């Protein structure tokens, strides 16, 4: 049996493109290998729009464990709409060799919190916690001074500093008296019965006074550190927001093997650019509130390789593709207000974007019907960003994931006429863990979608797809594991439009 339904395959391909557009972690676009295995000369440009809605509640306990999470204030939609462009072209040099070049945007994030909740504004509860910690420290040291606000903190510092100054003056006087008594005793040992008790008493008093002055000095230092942190945190304004973007340029060379040229191996280099900004605000992030980080644009290199089995007469195609991880040695500029001047600096760190494996399959069921299936694996559990200043202060990663992500999709397409084909698909994304980072609080998704392709001419066609995403409920956590939010019953839409050219 032989039947040509390549136009139908393209309709399903457009739908598949939008299916990956809000996957786990920072995943935004699939590998371009699907286009490289098209027949003949093929070129395309596509525009993808992601429109998620992710709302929830913050933690009324500010930051604690999942066991005693208490739903607090509303967190309005924190996921910004995101749009990106992909394009590429491939050509057959002869019946054996193919070449292609592709641009896609594989990793991205666009997050911006708003409203009145723990992800927005000055971290007043965190500042209050600093005052409480300072008061507890004084109490443990046997110093009875209240510290519940900035004024009382300054009063405590001034009071203890005055006591330290007075104590040091008494120590200086006692040391002078001790030196005089010791000199008198040395000059006239007969005075020992009188001077020895005095010298002993002075030495004991000096020892006790030295301990008290040292304790007071340490208390002033500790309180001054708390004061600096609280003052810096009190200047924090705005809302938590994150922006990460990437661009991939991939060149592929393919060779067909076998008597019928139905096995193709392909591979080539990838050039990837990565940049981003992170801004943490509000009580949720504890003393990291106010943290800013800028990831300067970096270009690094990787590779892609795969193997495909092709049987065009029944529209059969099975392809396994691997895209390598890529190490970016980026300059990251940080500002952690709680540390004052020590929290500002620029350092080089390595960010490794993850590898991925795609399995794509399609086959014609009859002359007008196409079955597709695909799976994708991304080891997000290996991914982490640990800035130098943030990591040194906390000992933690800024962003990381607990689980690897698996996605799967099954679709059917139907050719209605020589010009028009439609398709539908159902998909699943496992997500990358739950609880998960507060910068992407969903646990995967189930999705359904529709796609269509219309042939404008025998070579030119326009395709479109729309997909509805039902996000899994997730608890949001910060790097120390504290649960800071609960996000339930969220969804999203993804839209894709593609213009393509194909000449066999």
Model-derived segments and spans:
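N-terminal, post-signal peptide beta-strand-biased segments of exported outer-membrane/organellar beta-barrel
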Residues: 2-141
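Outer-membrane beta-barrel porins/channels
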Residues: 93-96, 104, 108-504
């Amino acid at each position: 049996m032989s039947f040509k339904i390549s136009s139908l395959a393209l309709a399903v391909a457009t739908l598949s493109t939008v299916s990956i557009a809000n996957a786990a972690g920072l995943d935004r676009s699939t590998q371009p290998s699907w286009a490289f295995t098209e027949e003949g000369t093929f070129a395309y440009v596509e525009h993808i729009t992601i429109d998620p809605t992710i709302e929830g509640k913050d933690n009324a306990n500010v930051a604690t464990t999942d066991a005693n999470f208490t739903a607090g204030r509303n967190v309005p939609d924190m996921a910004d709409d995101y749009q990106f462009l992909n394009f590429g072209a491939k050509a057959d040099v002869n019946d054996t060799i193919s070449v292609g070049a592709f641009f896609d945007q594989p990793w991205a994030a666009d997050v911006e919190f708003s409203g009145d909740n723990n992800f927005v504004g000055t971290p007043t509860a965190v500042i209050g916690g600093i005052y409480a910690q300072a008061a507890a420290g004084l109490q443990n040291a046997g110093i009875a001074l209240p510290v519940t606000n900035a004024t009382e903190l300054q009063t405590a510092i001034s009071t203890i500093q005055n006591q330290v100054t007075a104590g040091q003056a008494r120590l200086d006087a006692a040391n002078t008296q001790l030196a005089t008594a010791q000199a008198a005793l040395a000059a006239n040992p007969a005075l020992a019965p009188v001077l020895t008790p005095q010298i002993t008493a002075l030495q004991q008093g000096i020892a006790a006074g030295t301990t008290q002055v040292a304790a007071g000095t340490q208390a002033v230092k500790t309180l001054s550190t708390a004061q600096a942190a609280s003052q810096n945190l009190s200047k924090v304004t705005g809302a938590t927001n994150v922006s990460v973007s990437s661009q991939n340029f991939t060149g592929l060379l393919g060779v067909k093997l076998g008597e019928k040229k139905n096995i193709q191996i392909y591979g080539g280099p990838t050039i990837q650019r990565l940049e981003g900004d992170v801004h943490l605000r509000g009580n949720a992030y504890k003393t990291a509130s106010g943290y800013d980080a800028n990831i300067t644009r970096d270009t690094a290199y990787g590779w892609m390789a795969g193997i495909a089995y092709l049987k065009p007469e029944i529209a059969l195609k099975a392809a396994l593709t691997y895209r390598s991880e890529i190490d970016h040695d980026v300059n990251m500029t940080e500002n952690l207000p709680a540390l004052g001047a020590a929290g500002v600096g620029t350092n080089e760190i390595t960010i490794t974007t993850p590898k991925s494996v795609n399995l794509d399959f399609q086959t014609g069921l009859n002359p007008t019907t196409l079955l597709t299936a695909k799976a994708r694996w991304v080891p997000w559990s290996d991914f982490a960003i640990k800035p130098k200043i943030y990591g040194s202060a906390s000992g933690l990663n800024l962003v990381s994931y607990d689980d690897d992500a698996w996605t799967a999709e099954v679709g059917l397409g139907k050719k209605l006429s020589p010009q028009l084909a439609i398709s539908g698909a159902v998909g699943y994304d496992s997500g990358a863990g739950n609880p998960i980072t507060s910068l992407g609080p969903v646990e995967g998704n189930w999705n359904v979608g529709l796609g269509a392709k219309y042939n404008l001419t025998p070579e030119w066609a326009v395709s479109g797809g729309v997909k509805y995403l039902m996000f899994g409920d997730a608890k949001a956590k910060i790097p120390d594991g504290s649960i800071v939010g609960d996000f339930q019953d969220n969804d999203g839409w993804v839209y894709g439009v593609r213009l393509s050219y194909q000449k066999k």
